[in-house]
Amino acid sequence: TRAGRWRGHEKTECGIHLPASALAGDLRRTRVPLIKDGAYVEDAWLRIEGEAPLPSDGDVIVDWIRLKEEASLGHDRSGRLGVVFPNTEDANLLAPHLGRLALVALELPSFTDGRAFSQARVLRHQLGFSGELRATGNPKADQAAFLVRCGFDAFEVRGTQPLEVWQRMLASVSRVYQRGYSEGAGAVKS
């Protein structure tokens, strides 16, 4: 047996992984649980797949291809507009669209793929995006504090990590050497 490698079928003893049956009832209210401000919240946004028609009102999220191909998208309806932006694209491509976007969802396809962290920094620091910045795909609680430092303020949670783990991980970094998105100058914060 290698050290650090879980050998059992059920990973429930470590405190990070729980079976789906053990998840809190409020977690199951939305199709994809959403954590915002340290709590589960109901997702008010409707994700529109492909070329499906947009509803006349309500907040909608479209994919990047549709946003860039339809210049007037969202102008003839009430409700806010958001986009799912792939991590394979340069975040600067969103610059001409940011004035009409209230949400940008950045994809984290795997734990080892950090491109969305860089995109978030560009959106917040260089382009001045002030809307909701959502981590989608496969964000993990282990990344929570670092996602917030890059500017994320909402997380779609597809795994079985309970809210308590996310809250603990959000508070886990007590000293930092670089400024985060919403912090002032200073080399060390404690």
Segments (PLM) and residue ranges:
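C-terminal helical cap(s) of enzyme catalytic domains, especially alpha/beta-barrels
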Residues: E164-K189
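Catalytic cores of alpha/beta
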Residues: N92-P96, K140-D153
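Glycine-rich phosphate-binding active-site loops on the catalytic face of alpha/beta enzymes
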Residues: F152-L170
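Hydrophobic faces of well-ordered beta-strands that scaffold small-molecule active sites
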Residues: V60-V62, G79-V83, A102-L106, G131-A135, ...
